[in-house]
């Protein structure tokens, strides 16, 4: 295991933004106890924001476009802190994120079904032509 750590640096629900390299600008939601290195930015919602809404907002903002374009792309936290955007009140944010999460669950279910059907087709062809 590369980079194993036996303790955690963050606990709770966070949006994590890839800060360097190939994952620069990628956005994911994490929950529980996690260890984040200096190659990730942890975003925790305050009392005025919904974490899952921030996930969708930051993903939509395509943060990778703000990376330095050197040999290894990198996002500077101070550059991201200067970005401005208007957001609705928390209750509306929660409704929006719930709505989008419903779509994400449907998309994930369809992707699993497609993968299953693709595997079934491949197995059928192997049985047929072998």
Where are these regions (language model features)?
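DNA target-recognition domains and sequence-specific DNA-contacting regions of bacterial/archaeal
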Residues: 1-87
């Amino acid at each position: 295991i590369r980079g194993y750590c036996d303790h955690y640096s963050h606990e709770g629900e966070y949006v994590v933004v890839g800060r360097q390299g190939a994952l620069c600008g990628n956005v994911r939601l994490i929950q529980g106890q996690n260890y984040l290195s200096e190659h990730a930015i942890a975003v925790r919602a305050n009392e005025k924001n919904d974490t899952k809404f921030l996930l969708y907002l930051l993903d939509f903002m395509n943060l990778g476009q703000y990376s330095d374009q050197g040999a290894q792309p990198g996002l500077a936290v101070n550059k991201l802190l200067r970005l401005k955007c208007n957001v609705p009140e928390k209750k509306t944010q929660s409704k929006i994120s719930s709505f989008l999460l419903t779509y994400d669950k449907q998309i994930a279910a369809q992707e699993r079904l497609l993968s299953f059907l693709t595997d079934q087709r491949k197995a059928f062809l192997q049985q047929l032509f072998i």
